[in-house]
Amino acid sequence: MSDFQTYGGSDEENLEIRKLNSEVEADPDSFEAWEKLVRACESLEGGLNRNSSPQALATLRDSYDRFLLKFPLLFGYWKKYADLEFNISGPESAEMVYERGCASITNSVDLWTDYCSFKMETTHVAHLVRDLFERAATYVGLDFLAHPFWDKYIEYEERQEAQDKIYAILKRVINIPMHQYARYYERFRALSHTQPLTDIVEPEVLSRLRAEVEAEAAPFGVVKSELETERDVRAKIDAMFYDVFQTTQSETTKRWTYESEIKRPYFHVTELDHSQLANWRKYLDFEEEEGNLARITALYERCLVTCAFYDEFWFRYARWMSSQPNKEEEVRNIYLRAVTLFVPVSRPGIRLQFAYFEEACGRVETAQAIHEAILTKLPDCVEVIISAANLRRRQGGLDAAIDSYKAQIASPAVDLYTKAALVTHWAVLLWKVKGSVEEARNVYLNNVEWYADSREFWRSWLDFELEQPTTTESEAENGERISKVINEMRTRSRMSTATKKELCVKYLNYLQQRGVGKDAMKKFLDLDREMNGPASVSKDRFTAKENGQPLGELDEATRLKAEAHYFNFFEFFGEADPKATGVAEFH
């Protein structure tokens, strides 16, 4: 929008558009701000038409383009945009908008139906209209609520007086479990009575049914007339399609259990209730159990309109699709849609999973690029930095990973407490991958002066010393090293007393289970008294000091960083709480 010197309209309207534009740029996730901007652009110059100024029309198009790039699943706004283009520039411009909209939300029954209706009114070449209906049918024909689309398709063929094509459509539809399945069957049955036998069923089926009728009459020595034979064949055909109806009825009833619980079948920026997510999970479970690939895919696509901001369903879709043969590109497209449109970078898990997928497919440079793209937005994200370093380790060896850590530790863009966590992973690589305990220990010793306030640093160092293998002869020496880590942590770190006590519990466990000598329990009791005794004997026992003087405490914001716990995104996967109620947060 900044490319335009004027937005069209009066000075007052220009001022309002500038203000609304600023609000959108300040908070691009605000749906309300976007709606206000689009409405203001629509009302420029008293309402836009083909006689409006080029500036006003450009402003309108720019606002819609940006809005629908941000929220591409808003089928109603695609329809409004197409209507506006039709009024402003005619059918070709409107058709371009419909094409963009249907590419953005491929499974919208409403949008495809509107597009087909538009095509019916503006195109008089029958095969072009039918081609569009068939395209639409591949995307929305299986939808449980697809009846408006099929009604529109039948309406078009009625206008063409193409009874054979109406019959063919109905013959398809009666096999689809959907909300209004029964009325399609009734119409199909009535129409089939007026169609030639050769148009009702395939030639091989017709031959089989004729043979059955003749075989049934043969034992009685009866030779039926052609009219009688046709009557009996039609009765068999009617029974055959009644079986189809009953199957469709049964399949519809099964799905109604889940369909009836869907309260919001369209996209919106607000959260859903836990009960809605639970229903989608159960519905997907059902279709996967049924095993029809097309129906499963269609349901996932429906689900990911309603649940677009819930990354659990993107993960699920990608995992399911990856279990199907020869679906690498389809899986890639699922990840691309998730990361480019719906899941914010502040929740990097789906992006990391995408990177792992690309690495597994041999596209290592793409996997590296995904990590780098996340880090441009989240330079302090420990999980992503560690993931990137381990990607380099897998592809380039241990030194490549350590160089990656060193580069991040040296970067001014990385927070002090993030660096502390990275140092611990550097040490762990030396210990567990290279097998060098002394090099790993030196990393802790050489960095303690910088990261003494980091919980993650002390946790890692303490675990490192606790996990060293020992013998009866070396346990005492090992115990001294552990004791020194505990004493250093208590006296040098400005972490909260609660966090220090949490780490000291590890030492109490060690003393009880592996402590050596008569003084092990004395150390246990001394530490227990200082941790849990009354204030008269425990006061200031966990206060950091320098030259005997207490050090100042960390402010609250710094303390939260210093004492942060770090996790991998995949540690949070698990069964959803079936008892959860209320609104389900996106994250």
Residue ranges and their predicted role:
Residues M1-H587:
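Alpha-helical solenoid scaffolds in eukaryotic macromolecular assemblies
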